[in-house]
Amino acid sequence: MIKKNYEELVSFFADDEFILEMIADAMKSFPEYVNRVYSMETQMAIISVRYDGEERANRIASLDQKRRDAHEVAIGSCKMLNRLAEEAGVEKFCPETDDRYVVGDFCALITSEFFASGKNYNSLDELITNMKESVKGGINA
């Protein structure tokens, strides 16, 4: 559903290179936020065993700031894409909120939906179940 609405938005602005560039940049912000969360979570475990005291705190604070910055960009991207969708008369596909948790969940959802493009799943749950089974088979092989 998100992808369909996104494609309608892009089609509406097909002749406006500047707007298309803005849309492309906004869409990049969602997987970038997901990547920042992933990076922070994986690096924190390493930082926790390698550093103590102030050095540990500084490194974790730096990771958290990068994640927060990416989150703010994603929130701004949602607002901009919703304004463009309204202008185009197409259904908005971003949440209309400043709630950090909602926008964070949206970033994961939209990234998953585009990742699953071309695969025939009826739901995100089905996609995740299938992905877990696929990875499990590869790990135990």
Place the predicted regions along the sequence by residue.
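N-terminal leader/targeting segments
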Residues: V10-S11, T111-S112, A141
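Intrinsic disorder/low-complexity segments in short proteins, especially the signal peptide
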Residues: A14, E86, F114, T129-K132
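Short, charge/polar-rich alpha-helical segments
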Residues: L9-E32
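N-terminal leader/targeting signatures
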Residues: E8-L9, A26, V102, I110
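Short, low-complexity interaction segments enriched in Ser/Thr/Pro/Gly
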Residues: M1, D25, L63, A116, ...
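Acidic, low-complexity, intrinsically disordered interaction modules
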Residues: N35-L124
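Short intrinsically disordered terminal tails
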Residues: M1-E8, T129-A141
